[in-house]
């Protein structure tokens, strides 16, 4: 995969899995098998060996980068003659639907918390910043859910700006995958973390992607380090269909689920509907809005069969 893309060859250092794993440099494993089980997403097969080979070296890299930024901050405070300021380090994780962004984010959060320099690590997903279901229906955007126009970008940018500026308590809306909507009256409070991990489809987009105003600030303007989780589209579609079948047997069986009407489908019917959703919504969104932002990332995690990481690309 890495050899076919001349842009990636120009911009990134490429590591095969074995080469990357050596960079762990004796960082201890801090997760148990039970911990990992709690962090896995639906249809995810990540193992402790995957954590050892891929995520421990990445946590070491991020620790070194965060420490460097903390030191630069102290130098600036001393130069300005001011009290030490608090500005969270912000890591974004982007990628397609079904690629495993959420699992990657949860594993990194768990690992980064064990470093003494940054024990407070919060995780926020941009799903909560999707417009409420009623608004999407009113705007005719229900079939565009996940596309840039389905997000309340003003609210998202205001949230990330407030966190970055060091505000004591900042609230983020919470999304329910059962009701397919924001949860009214509930929020997640972010209180001056050392690191904030922001996970979502759209976190690498910039003002250049905006049809409205290229000058307005975007999430990427506030991000210190960005990660893109990548895979070939035929694998992503396959994983989405497999996940859809898992949901049909699990979450969709809940009578409160927005997709409860899918619970009684046969395997063939469920596969056909999942394929149609991919071909009409998730696939086009990937091709038009998500994948074009890939080479903006500081690091790309490339997945192959069975969700296993095959290569890591690190910006030069």
Swiss-Prot record:
- Please name the Pfam families in this protein's record: PRK (PF00485)
Its Gene Ontology cellular component terms are: cytoplasm
Instruction: Name the Enzyme Commission number(s) assigned to this protein.
Output: 2.7.1.33
Gene Ontology MF terms: ATP binding; pantothenate kinase activity
Record keyword Metal-binding present: no
| Alphabetical list of SUPFAM superfamilies matching this protein | P-loop containing nucleoside triphosphate hydrolases (SSF52540)
* Pathway field: Cofactor biosynthesis; coenzyme A biosynthesis; CoA from (R)-pantothenate: step 1/5
Keywords, A to Z? ATP-binding, Coenzyme A biosynthesis, Cytoplasm, Kinase, Nucleotide-binding, Transferase
Q: What is its main location?
A: cytoplasm
Q: Which GO terms describe its biological process?
A: coenzyme A biosynthetic process
Q: Which principal EC class is assigned to this enzyme? A: transferase
Catalytic reaction annotation: (R)-pantothenate + ATP = (R)-4'-phosphopantothenate + ADP + H(+)
The UniProt record gives the binding positions of ATP as 95-102
Which protein family is it in? Belongs to the prokaryotic pantothenate kinase family.
* Stored HAMAP family: Pantothen_kinase_1
**The protein's name in its UniProt record:** Pantothenate kinase
UniProt organism field: Shewanella sp. (strain ANA-3)
């Amino acid at each position: 995969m890495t050899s076919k893309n001349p842009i990636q060859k120009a911009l990134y250092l490429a590591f095969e899995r074995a080469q990357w794993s050596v960079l762990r440099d004796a960082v201890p494993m801090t997760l148990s098998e039970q911990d990992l089980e709690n962090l896995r997403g639906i249809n995810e097969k990540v193992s402790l060996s995957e954590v050892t080979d891929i995520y421990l070296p990445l946590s070491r890299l991020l620790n070194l980068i965060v420490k460097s930024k903390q030191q630069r901050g102290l130098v600036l405070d001393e130069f300005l003659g001011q009290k030490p300021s608090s500005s969270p380090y912000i890591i974004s994780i982007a990628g397609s639907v079904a690629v495993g962004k959420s699992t990657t984010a949860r594993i990194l959060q768990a690992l980064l918390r064990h470093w003494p320099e940054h024990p407070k690590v919060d995780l926020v997903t941009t799903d909560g910043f999707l417009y409420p279901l009623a608004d999407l229906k009113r705007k005719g955007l229900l079939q565009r859910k996940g596309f840039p126009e389905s997000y309340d970008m003003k609210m998202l940018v205001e949230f990330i700006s407030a966190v970055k500026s060091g505000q004591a308590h900042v609230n983020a809306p919470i999304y329910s995958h059962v009701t397919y909507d924001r949860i009214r009256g509930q929020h997640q409070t972010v209180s001056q973390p050392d690191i904030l991990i922001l996970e979502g489809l759209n976190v690498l987009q910039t003002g250049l992607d905006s049809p409205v105003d290229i000058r307005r600030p975007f999430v990427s303007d506030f991000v210190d380090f960005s990660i893109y989780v990548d895979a070939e589209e035929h694998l992503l579609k396959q994983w989405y269909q497999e996940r859809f079948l898992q949901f049909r047997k699990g979450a969709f069986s809940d009578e409160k689920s927005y997709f409860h009407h899918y619970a009684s489908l046969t395997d063939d019917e469920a596969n056909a509907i999942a394929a149609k959703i991919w071909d009409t919504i998730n696939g086009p969104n990937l091709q038009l809005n998500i994948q074009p932002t890939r080479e903006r990332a500081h690091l790309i995690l490339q997945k192959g069969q069975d969700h296993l990481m095959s290569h890591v690309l690190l910006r030069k």
